[in-house]
């Protein structure tokens, strides 16, 4: 599991006015909650978070939150509020992580070997990814940044379901998996070719 460190400082002033001043200074108001400790208000460097939030790992990995240069606190991102039209993160929520408590996290799917699969090499075939992430349950030490889905054997007309995915050791789906809930993940089918537009009325009639 990769180590992703985020620097933070404790926040003394709270409220809308204080948050507005922080944003003007290039900082983001944030909070840490959960576990057996009280919530802690913190502030983050906007540039660091703006760059981090462009990566998958920021949403699905355990983050090492370094507050005031002290020991890192293990957290998960639980909410990130963006400005509706400006490139601005408004607020961030982190949840504390306990090493012996299972997590429920949405983990991205990475599809490999699609281009070299029978369906990928066939002409006139459309391959659609119905899901791009799955909700999994696991201990923090077992949390993967992503799960690979091998499409090397994908054929035209085939459907890959959740039950076909191989999950890492210690990782399982958060929801029940049965016939009714075994969702399609990848579908490979022939492209639909539309007929030419019908001839206009009277076209081709003899005069």
From Swiss-Prot:
What GO terms fall under cellular component here? cytosolic large ribosomal subunit
Q: Which domain of life is it from?
A: Bacteria
Which Gene Ontology BP terms does the record give?
translation
InterPro entries referenced in this protein's UniProt entry, alphabetically? Rbsml_bL25/Gln-tRNA_synth_N, Ribosomal_bL25/Gln-tRNA_synth, Ribosomal_bL25_b-dom, Ribosomal_bL25_C, Ribosomal_bL25_long, Ribosomal_bL25_short, Ribosomal_L25_dom, Ribosomal_uL5_bac-type
Its Gene Ontology molecular function terms? 5S rRNA binding; structural constituent of ribosome
Q: What are the UniProt keywords, alphabetically?
A: Ribonucleoprotein, Ribosomal protein, RNA-binding, rRNA-binding
Give positions of region: Disordered: 1-20
Q: Which PANTHER family match?
A: RIBOSOMAL PROTEIN L25/GLN-TRNA SYNTHETASE, ANTI-CODON-BINDING DOMAIN-CONTAINING PROTEIN, RIBOSOMAL PROTEIN L25_GLN-TRNA SYNTHETASE, ANTI-CODON-BINDING DOMAIN-CONTAINING PROTEIN
General function of this protein = This is one of the proteins that binds to the 5S RNA in the ribosome where it forms part of the central protuberance.
HAMAP family (UniProt xref): Ribosomal_bL25, Ribosomal_bL25_CTC
Quaternary structure? Part of the 50S ribosomal subunit; part of the 5S rRNA/L5/L18/L25 subcomplex. Contacts the 5S rRNA. Binds to the 5S rRNA independently of L5 and L18.
The entry assigns this protein to a family as follows: Belongs to the bacterial ribosomal protein bL25 family. CTC subfamily.
Query: Under which name does UniProt file this protein?
Result: Large ribosomal subunit protein bL25
Q: Which gene encodes it?
A: rplY
């Amino acid at each position: 599991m990769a180590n992703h460190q985020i620097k933070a400082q404790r926040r003394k002033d709270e409220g809308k006015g204080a948050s507005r001043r922080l944003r003007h200074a290039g900082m983001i108001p944030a909070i840490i909650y959960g576990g057996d400790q009280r919530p802690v208000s913190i502030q983050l460097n906007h540039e660091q978070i703006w760059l981090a939030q462009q990566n998958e790992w920021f949403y699905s990995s355990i983050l090492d939150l370094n507050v005031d240069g002290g020991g890192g606190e293990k957290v998960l991102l639980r909410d990130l509020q963006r400005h509706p039209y400006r490139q601005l993160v408004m607020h961030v929520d982190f949840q504390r992580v306990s090493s012996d408590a299972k997590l429920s996290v949405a983990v991205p799917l990475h599809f490999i070997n699609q281009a070299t699969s029978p369906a990928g090499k066939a002409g006139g075939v459309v391959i659609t990814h119905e899901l791009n992430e799955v909700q999994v349950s696991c201990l923090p030490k077992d949390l993967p940044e992503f799960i690979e889905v091998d499409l090397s054997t994908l054929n035209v007309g085939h459907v890959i379901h959740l039950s076909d995915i191989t999950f890492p050791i210690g990782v399982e789906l958060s929801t029940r998996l049965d016939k009714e809930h075994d969702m399609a993940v990848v579908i490979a089918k022939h492209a639909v070719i539309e007929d030419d537009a019908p001839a206009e009325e009277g076209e081709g009639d003899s005069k």
